[in-house]
UniProtKB/Swiss-Prot annotation:
Segments crossing the lipid bilayer: 1-21, 90-110
Name of the encoding gene: uspB
Periplasmic domain ranges by topology: 111
Organism name: Salmonella typhimurium (strain LT2 / SGSC1412 / ATCC 700720)
HAMAP family: UspB
Cytoplasmic side: 22-89
Main localisation: membrane
A GO-annotated cellular component: plasma membrane
Coiled coil (UniProt feature): none
Cellular localisation: Cell inner membrane
UniProt name for this protein: Universal stress protein B
Recorded family membership: Belongs to the universal stress protein B family.
Amino acid sequence: MISTVSLFWALCVVCIVNMARYFSSLRALLVVLRGCDPLLYQYVDGGGFFTTHGQPNKQVRLVWYIYAQRYRDHHDEEFIRRCERVRRQFLLTSALCGLVVVSLIALMIWH
């Protein structure tokens, strides 16, 4: 029988791997964005997005831009595909993180 603690740690590893995939896809999206829409790139602070001096309010703008699917009217097909991918990975990673939190609470209650 598989230990519940082992299952929890496996779920944590899967969540971390998906977070890494999400950030990698987001970085690739910013590269495409810099080439196809420099104004939007500046609007979401593309140059300082992954730095310590990045502006969180501008970073949240990109997240909401993708979450609300406002990219669908964009002229560049590559950008639209990247946004779709980032959106799917964001939803998957959010669900996995929620599952990790619920699993941690359940693990604390039962052990």
